[in-house]
Amino acid sequence: MEPTVHRLINGDSRDLSFLSDGSVHLVVTSPPYWNLKRYNENPDQIGHIQDYEAFLLELEKVWRHVYRILVPGGRLVCVVGDVCVARRDFGRHLVFPLHADICVICRRIGFDNLNPIIWHKIANASYEVENGSKFLGKPYEP
């Protein structure tokens, strides 16, 4: 068996031009959760975008590159959750369906969407909730 070659590239996933068309079998990613967390101080970080629709447009650039580089039958695995925003930010409690919006964008690009896998993750609850909310900062019950 031939040895495999691995490269780790630190860059912007909105530009994957260094990868050839149809050269990747699997992409696993967890995009930023819109503006809920400061990931770093890089001004180009898409997690810093305040407008949700503008954020989705930037994510679409990523998905278009991913679609181009995947082999026929290749897979994109996207670990993402919906985004709950507090009343203090929008005057009312809102849930932005990030997972559904990504599915719609990817389907328009040409991806075949499979059923989502729901992960009931509560391990980070102590970081997300200060007032003991039973919903743990998530749009669904634990």
Located regions from the model:
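Core catalytic lobe of class I
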Residues: 1-142
